[in-house]
């Protein structure tokens, strides 16, 4: 009995240590991101590591984490029934076994589809929700949200639910006055990164 208690305490200690270490890792990345004097180059995995798993999948996020990437960029779309999923395109055609616009599909129906890899081959992976993806990344990697600006009220509710506000980077290409007007209530809660188009002069 005494040995069992000791083992249980050891397991609890190890788990708590892992959680603290993971949180510290994210804070280190965040501090580097915010430090204008830092000479460290932060690595971003665009749509996750899509070379080893389908883009915008939890497997692609896991792979980026395993590679010790600093930030994973993911794209968000909204389903017919108002659920948030990971998908770059407005349609399902290119990256899944389905066809048509995402806005015409419910989450339940999308979950029946399979994701395709970079070569268009069908895999066993399914389309993840934003919540599933944030829980995969939680405490392990910073998350850059794309295509989230216009639906950020919905996005933020999930950030609160998953307690991942501290590791998310929101972005947009709008003028600063527009951002303050439309996004102002969130500017002290999440990081905001303006997209600068060097082609526009």
Task: Show which residues each predicted segment covers.
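Bacterial Sec-dependent N-terminal signal peptides
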Residues: 1-26
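Phosphate-group recognition and catalysis centered on beta-loop-alpha active-site segments
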Residues: 23-201
């Amino acid at each position: 009995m005494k040995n069992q208690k000791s083992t249980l305490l050891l397991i609890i200690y190890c788990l708590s240590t892992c959680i603290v270490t993971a949180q510290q890792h994210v804070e280190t990345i965040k501090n580097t991101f915010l430090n204008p004097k830092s000479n460290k180059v932060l690595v971003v995995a665009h749509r996750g590591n899509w070379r080893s798993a389908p883009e915008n999948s939890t497997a692609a996020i896991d792979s980026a984490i395993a590679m010790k990437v600093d930030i994973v960029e993911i794209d968000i779309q909204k389903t017919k029934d108002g659920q948030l999923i990971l998908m770059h395109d407005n349609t399902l055609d290119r990256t899944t076994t389905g066809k048509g616009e995402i806005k015409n599909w419910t989450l339940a129906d999308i979950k029946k589809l399979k994701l395709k890899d970079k070569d268009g081959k069908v895999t066993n992976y399914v389309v993840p929700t934003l919540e599933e993806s944030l829980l995969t990344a939680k405490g392990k990697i910073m998350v850059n949200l794309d295509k989230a600006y216009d639906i950020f009220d919905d996005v933020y509710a999930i950030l609160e639910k998953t307690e991942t506000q501290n590791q998310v980077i929101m972005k947009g290409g709008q003028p600063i006055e527009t951002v303050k007007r439309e996004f102002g209530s969130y500017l002290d809660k999440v990081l905001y990164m303006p997209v600068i188009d060097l082609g526009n002069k």
